[in-house]
Amino acid sequence: MHAYARNISTTAADTTVLEDVRANFGDFSDKTLSSYKSALERLFVIEDVPAWCPAIRSRTAIRSTRKKEFTDPSIAVAALGASPQRLLADLQTFGFIFETLCIRDLRAYTSAIGGKLSYYRDRYGLESDCVLHLPDGRFALIEFKLGNRQIEEGAAHLVQIRELIHEANASKPGVRIEEPSLMMVVTGGSLAYTRKDGVHVVPIGCLKQ
């Protein structure tokens, strides 16, 4: 649990988790790790997020590893033994915990309408922390940014992905990719607004079913 929590909201390979476990607890086989993961999934303790692989880059450029997530961020915090003071002193870890919180809320709020979550990341550093898919084919590109200073970066990523979709549709007219119905940066702030580029900035407290 501790090793998994150390890699929360990342695409770290299972071998990375295994090395972490072995460093702290000695001999531990990959078969044992796999059985532990299966048990935690059945108990709804962990629920990894699959990758979204649209035809906007070559398949080798788009990451396909599942992103590691707990069903609730409090489990990760408990596994890490992290206090509020420790999280405030380690904003990178706090950011990953915040991402898990957002994923949990979006899963809860959209499950009734058949919403499914994935993520996008390529080898060039372009990413969308979450892609929300609806049964009718519509989807939203979403970034999670704990601090207001990161909003610009998150919005830029979403706009770039939208532009890649435009370019892919223009170059392959016979294979059209739907464009995002919504681009949103979820923040830990208190102000909600829409930017000139069409990206909505939404505090996590404003999310609802």
Can you describe what each PLM-predicted range is?
Residues M1-R138:
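Accessory nucleic acid-recognition modules appended to NTPase machines
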Residues L18, A155-N169:
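Short, well-ordered amphipathic alpha-helices
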Residues A78, I151-E153, A192-K196:
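Switch/connector loops and helix/strand junctions flanking conserved nucleotide-binding motifs
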Residues R123, E153-G154:
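Basic, glycine-rich polyanion-binding accessory segments appended to enzymes
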Residues R138-A140, L182:
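Structural motif
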Residues A140-R149, H157:
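Active-site ExK catalytic segment of metal-dependent nucleases
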Residues E163-L182:
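Short mixed-charge
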Residues S181-Q209:
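Domain-level recognition of nuclease-like catalytic cores that cleave nucleotide substrates
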